[in-house]
Design a protein with these regions (language model features):
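Histidine- and acidic-residue-rich, metal-dependent catalytic cores
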Residues: 2-159
Length: 159
């Protein structure tokens, strides 16, 4: 879903400071840039909407890009899953987001609950709250797991 960030690595993860307005504008272009990559192969067509819509709000009234209507996508539920996961990762990881401080898992869950129905799919938020094993695993990943996950990706795909 974030393949478009490959085009903007000079903006992302570079400095220990807040992003400028221009840098934020460039980062907001990554869904469209990602779509360009995916259009190279017809086999990737089913990923177009999730790449384009993973920063749109559940209710379609916020997020970006403005001209994409996630509420009409046949892949809406997948967009909702990727959106929630992306927000959780962005908020809790310490690796690769030098421009902001990570949040606690509890704070992120509070934000997900607060945004349920507007920004996030309420059924997905409820699912996390209703399944203790899922909640605990997500909490473990948020607190300890990102470096291990990145190392596994490196071991399996980059070497």
């Amino acid at each position: 879903h974030d393949i478009g960030k490959n085009s903007i690595v000079s903006v992302v993860n570079n400095d220990y400071r807040q992003l400028s307005d221009e840098e934020r504008r460039i980062i907001r272009m990554h869904p469209r840039m990602g779509l360009k990559y995916l259009k190279i192969s017809k086999e990737l067509k089913s990923y177009h909407d999730t790449t384009l819509g993973h920063h749109k709000w559940y209710n379609g009234k916020g997020g970006y890009p403005n001209d994409f209507d996630n509420t009409k996508s046949p892949y809406r539920f997948m967009i909702d899953i990727i959106t929630l996961c992306d927000c959780m990762q962005a908020a809790t990881e310490r690796v690769g987001r030098n421009y902001k401080q990570e949040k606690s898992f509890e704070k992120v869950m509070g934000e997900l609950r607060e945004g349920a129905g507007t920004r996030y799919n309420p059924d997905l938020v409820k699912l996390i709250d209703d399944i203790p094993e899922l909640y605990k695993e997500l909490e473990r990943i948020a607190i300890y797991g990102w470096p291990d996950i990145y190392y596994e990706i490196y071991k399996n795909y980059m070497r």
